[in-house]
């Protein structure tokens, strides 16, 4: 069974490992850098940019895969799924138009407005800097609301800036908005949104064009440093619970979040056609219930590393069901285990990361700790590993409870040597209790 995988990060390493649990799978990977984890379990690799559509076509024509799985968002934005589907290859990953749920924040917000989907918020879209933009921010200020400035297109998770975090106040938000236009960050268009106050969580679903089947809820930790301090990153780690919920998330709030995603899928279908792939909803649990921060048209990273290792159902079967519209025929099961994921990242990340420095990894010690190792933005050259400037590698601990899973992950994360750092508090009971208290305060 030949499977084409596009992408070379930790998320794709998790996807590759999940696919290879089926002994019939022959894995053919197209990726930019030599990710040693993916390389080791691939039958053949094509080293090309994941957005190089002609290279994707050439590789697919050569290997003739029976299934394709697209990992990152960038290939979706340039129509990689459209190409593969046109070639007659069952593909996991939405076509370019449905993928706008991630690639165009304006499309996403307008969809919520048009179809009256719950969980929306105040926003406005702008294609130039001017009085209208300033007036909207001033109106938000008069309402006592801070704002979030979001470039409308893809920025690798690093273009969004929030008042009270990266921005001092709404006046500084105007300055950053002008910078986005001047530098054409994320394509140059902008969404200004009200800042949500609450606790974040993520919810993933497998989507087959009509049906959505949910995975366990996960909490990501985007801040760079312990105690949720420092700049926003692509995610420093995450955890999930044995009951597939989260300690601060009631069954009612989880159900509301699921209904928001269900209506989103049907609305995408009505607006631009069926969505076949992974869908990741980033939510804020507020005093008014769950609100959607944004959607991703793929697995979250790091969340994929929490979810895929505890998937009991054959992932190959799930992927075919997604591509062929047959998820209603699949009995989706996850283990009732806790997971904790922790990332090591380059010193200076995400602002000014060191690059091309050697990273030493004691794989045997990580294995002895009963953790799972996932390589991310790593390039292997002449038998040595080099960091490339983004998140480097992650470890995952899995156990009967959060406390034990965190101990496993922490023991494993200490086996990296190089110019890297990590957050030691992810999955700790102290940090989780802070989330619980925060939600209690919101309810008052």
UniProtKB/Swiss-Prot annotation:
Q: Which cofactor does it need?
A: Mg(2+); Mn(2+)
The keyword Membrane appears for this protein: no
- Which PROSITE patterns did the record assign? ATP_GRASP, GARS
Annotated GO molecular function terms are:
ATP binding; metal ion binding; phosphoribosylamine-glycine ligase activity
Q: Where is the ATP-grasp domain?
A: 109-324
A Gene Ontology biological process noted in the UniProt record is: purine nucleobase biosynthetic process
Entry cofactor note text? Binds 2 magnesium or manganese ions per subunit.
| Annotated binding of Mn(2+) 1, by residue | 282, 294
Q: Where does Mn(2+) 2 bind?
A: 294, 296
Q: Quick one: which residues bind Mg(2+) 1?
A: 282, 294
Q: Which Gene3D superfamilies match?
A: 3.40.50.20, ATP-grasp fold, A domain (3.30.1490.20), ATP-grasp fold, B domain (3.30.470.20), Phosphoribosylglycinamide synthetase, C-terminal domain (3.90.600.10)
Q: What is its EC number?
A: 6.3.4.13
Pfam families registered for this protein in UniProt: GARS_A, GARS_C, GARS_N
Write out the catalysed reaction: 5-phospho-beta-D-ribosylamine + glycine + ATP = N(1)-(5-phospho-beta-D-ribosyl)glycinamide + ADP + phosphate + H(+)
Question: Which pathway does this polypeptide act in?
Answer: Purine metabolism; IMP biosynthesis via de novo pathway; N(1)-(5-phospho-D-ribosyl)glycinamide from 5-phospho-alpha-D-ribose 1-diphosphate: step 2/2
SUPFAM superfamilies per the UniProt record, alphabetical:
Glutathione synthetase ATP-binding domain-like (SSF56059), PreATP-grasp domain (SSF52440), Rudiment single hybrid motif (SSF51246)
Q: Which residues cross the membrane?
A: none
- The source's domain of life comes to Archaea
This protein is called Phosphoribosylamine--glycine ligase
What is the source species? Methanococcus maripaludis (strain C5 / ATCC BAA-1333)
């Amino acid at each position: 069974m030949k499977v084409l995988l596009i992408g070379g990060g930790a998320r794709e390493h998790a996807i590759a490992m999940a696919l290879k649990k089926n002994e019939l799978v022959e894995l053919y990977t197209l990726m930019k850098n030599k990710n040693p984890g993916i390389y080791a379990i691939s039958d053949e690799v094509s080293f090309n940019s994941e957005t190089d559509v002609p290279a994707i076509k050439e590789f697919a024509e050569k290997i003739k895969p029976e299934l394709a799985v697209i990992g990152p968002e960038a290939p979706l934005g340039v129509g990689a799924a459209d190409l593969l589907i046109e070639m007659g290859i069952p593909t996991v990953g939405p076509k370019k138009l449905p993928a706008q749920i991630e690639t165009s924040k304006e499309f996403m917000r307008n969809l919520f407005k048009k179809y009256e989907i719950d969980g929306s918020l105040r926003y406005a879209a702008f294609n130039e800097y001017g009085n209208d933009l300033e007036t909207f921010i001033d109106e938000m200020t008069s309402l006592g609301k801070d704002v979030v400035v979001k470039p409308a297109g893809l920025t690798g998770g690093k273009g969004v800036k929030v008042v009270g975090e990266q921005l001092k106040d709404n006046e500084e938000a105007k300055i950053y908005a002008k910078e986005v236009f001047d530098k054409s960050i994320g394509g140059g268009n902008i969404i200004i949104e009200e800042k949500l106050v609450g606790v974040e969580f993520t919810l993933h679903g497998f989507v087959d064009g009509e049906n959505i089947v949910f995975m366990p809820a996960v909490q990501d930790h985007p801040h760079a440093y312990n105690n949720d301090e420092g700049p926003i990153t692509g995610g420093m780690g995450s955890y999930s619970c044995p009951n597939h919920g989260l300690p601060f998330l009631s069954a009612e709030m989880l159900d509301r979040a699921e209904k928001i995603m269900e209506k989103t899928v049907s609305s995408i279908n009505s607006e631009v056609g069926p969505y076949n792939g992974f869908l990741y909803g980033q939510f804020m649990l507020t005093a008014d219930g769950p609100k959607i921060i944004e959607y991703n048209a793929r697995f979250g990273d790091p969340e994929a590393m929490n979810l895929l290792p505890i998937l009991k159902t054959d992932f190959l079967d799930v992927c075919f069901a997604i591509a062929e519209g047959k998820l209603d025929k699949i009995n989706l099961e996850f283990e009732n285990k806790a997971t904790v994921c922790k990332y090591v990242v380059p010193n200076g990340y995400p602002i000014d990361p060191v690059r091309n420095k050697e990273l030493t990894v004691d794989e045997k010690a990580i294995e002895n700790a009963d953790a799972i190792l996932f390589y991310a933005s790593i390039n292997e050259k002449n038998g040595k590993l080099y960091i490339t400037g983004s998140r480097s590698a992650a470890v995952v601990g899995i156990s009967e409870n959060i406390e034990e899973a965190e101990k496993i992950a922490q023991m494993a994360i200490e086996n990296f040597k190089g110019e890297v750092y990590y957050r030691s508090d992810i999955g700790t009971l102290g940090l989780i209790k802070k989330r619980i208290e925060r939600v209690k305060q919101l309810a008052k």
